[in-house]
């Protein structure tokens, strides 16, 4: 026998109707399963209520400061990274750094001066630190800001 889509039925007992409580004196009537008297019988206790203990949102410190929405974020590449990724020297731009996996696509690049540079490179990036600019020119290379 093949089962057809229109013959499918839920398993017996898996679909039970919602119990309507507090409707008359029958089962689940009157106190509606809440017991007698007390806060829990009369109304809901807030989820955040901790029984008189100082609540967690008041125990934790407030966050200080703010996050500037207009800040420009740069991907950082050090001079030592350029030396390691381009041992033969040459022209180094954002596209070459993306191809080598040093930075992500469509990101602004800032070159910092950590590490040593032993090869002549022509670097083009969005920003340069002073020490990076000095090290690149000292190695015989050139710096171009985009």
UniProtKB/Swiss-Prot annotation:
What is the superkingdom listed in this entry's lineage?
Bacteria
Gene3D superfamilies cross-referenced by the UniProt entry:
3.100.10.10
GO CC aspect terms:
cytosolic large ribosomal subunit
Keyword set includes rRNA-binding = yes
Region (Disordered), start-end ranges: 1-52
The alphabetized UniProt keywords are:
Ribonucleoprotein, Ribosomal protein, RNA-binding, rRNA-binding
For biological process, the GO terms are:
translation
Membrane: is it a keyword of this entry?
A: no
Q: Can you provide one Gene Ontology molecular function annotated for this UniProt record?
A: rRNA binding
**What InterPro entries does the annotation carry?**
Ribosomal_uL15, Ribosomal_uL15/eL18, Ribosomal_uL15/eL18_sf, Ribosomal_uL15_bac-type, Ribosomal_uL15_CS
- Listed Basic and acidic residues bias regions: 1-10
Task: State the oligomer form and interacting partners.
Answer: Part of the 50S ribosomal subunit.
Protein task: Binds to the 23S rRNA.
Q: Which family does it belong to?
A: Belongs to the universal ribosomal protein uL15 family.
Q: Which HAMAP family match?
A: Ribosomal_uL15
What is this protein's record name?
Answer: Large ribosomal subunit protein uL15
Q: Which organism is it from?
A: Mycolicibacterium paratuberculosis (strain ATCC BAA-968 / K-10)
Classification from the root reads: Bacteria, Bacillati, Actinomycetota, Actinomycetes, Mycobacteriales
């Amino acid at each position: 026998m093949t089962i057809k889509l229109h013959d499918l039925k839920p398993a017996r007992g898996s679909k039970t109707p919602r119990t309507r409580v507090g409707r008359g004196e029958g089962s689940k009537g009157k106190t509606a399963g809440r017991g007698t008297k007390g806060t829990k019988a009369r109304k809901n206790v807030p989820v955040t209520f901790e029984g008189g203990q100082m609540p967690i949102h008041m125990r934790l410190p407030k966050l200080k400061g703010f996050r500037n929405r207009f800040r420009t974020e740069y991907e950082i590449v050090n001079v030592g990274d350029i030396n390691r990724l381009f041992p033969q020297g040459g022209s180094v731009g954002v596209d070459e750094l993306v191809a080598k996996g040093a930075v992500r696509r469509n990101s602004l690049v800032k070159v910092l001066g950590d590490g040593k540079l032993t090869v002549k490179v022509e670097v083009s990036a969005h920003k340069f630190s002073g020490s990076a600019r000095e090290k690149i020119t000292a190695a015989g290379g050139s710096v171009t800001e985009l």
